[in-house]
Amino acid sequence: IKAGIVPAELIFTNPHYRPEMQGRRPPGDIWTHICGVDLVRTGEDGFVVLEDNCRTPSGVSYMLENREMMMRLFPDLFAEHRIRPVETYTDMLLASLRASAPEHAGADPNIVVLTPGPFNSAYYEHSFLADKLGVELVEGGDLFVNDDIVFMRTTEGPKRVDVIYRRIDDDFLDPTVFRK
């Protein structure tokens, strides 16, 4: 904006612009862990980005399940065409989430996947990812804050949460600021 490259009104009239976030820095200065990019092939060597989604990208569970089934049904096809593997996705995601944990969490931080619940269109994916990552799937009501520390309610009592992989749209993240 200051350089005059991007018009101010383009930013300030965007429905995803969050003035409440001005001056805030994310933990570890990590602005996004996952970005879903939809590519379209335009020719032999050409690609165009159709959409990028850094907020709450979804669809990876279907891709992973599809690939597993396709490899089972057509193993020769994958060998002949040197199709790159994708089965390490959840390992890489877990490593990224662990790397974002605060130092006090140690080598095995408590990570949760935060979902809006079973009525969300991407709930299958939230459940799938939590299962593959080996972490808890939680809703907002499962969490509470005490002395600036997030805890998860469990049958064994409160358990500290070190990393939240949120799968809630920005508009519904904080009911004191955004939509309720």
Each model region followed by its residue ranges:
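Domain-scale recognition of functional cores that engage charged ligands
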Residues: I1-K180
